[in-house]
Amino acid sequence: MDPIISAASVIGAGLSIGLAAIGPGIGQGTAAGQAVEGIARQPEAENKIRGVLLLSLAFMEALTIYGLVVALALLFANPFNT
């Protein structure tokens, strides 16, 4: 394999997982903070808020997993390999 393609694949894999983790990381922090604030304001709605929060966190985490899949594809099943 060409060393330039190898290097570009490694850099691309690093960028894909790094950039895929930034958005969900910020979103999860914001969502958790707002959930804690909502529970503090309305303790009787704790179960409903917690359920929605966990579902939202799972959807946000899926974006990071997609970035991981792209990174693994670039590293191990390199589509640019000739």
UniProtKB/Swiss-Prot annotation:
Keywords annotated in UniProt: ATP synthesis, CF(0), Chloroplast, Hydrogen ion transport, Ion transport, Lipid-binding, Membrane, Plastid, Thylakoid, Transmembrane, Transmembrane helix, Transport
Signal peptide: none
Organism: Phaeodactylum tricornutum (strain CCAP 1055/1)
Gene: atpH
Function description: F(1)F(0) ATP synthase produces ATP from ADP in the presence of a proton or sodium gradient. F-type ATPases consist of two structural domains, F(1) containing the extramembraneous catalytic core and F(0) containing the membrane proton channel, linked together by a central stalk and a peripheral stalk. During catalysis, ATP synthesis in the catalytic domain of F(1) is coupled via a rotary mechanism of the central stalk subunits to proton translocation.
Primary site of residence: plastid
Subcellular localization(s) per the UniProt record: Plastid, Chloroplast thylakoid membrane
Transmembrane segments: 3-23, 57-77
Family: Belongs to the ATPase C chain family.
Protein topology in the membrane: Multi-pass membrane protein
Designated name of the protein: ATP synthase subunit c, chloroplastic
Gene Ontology molecular functions: lipid binding; proton-transporting ATP synthase activity, rotational mechanism
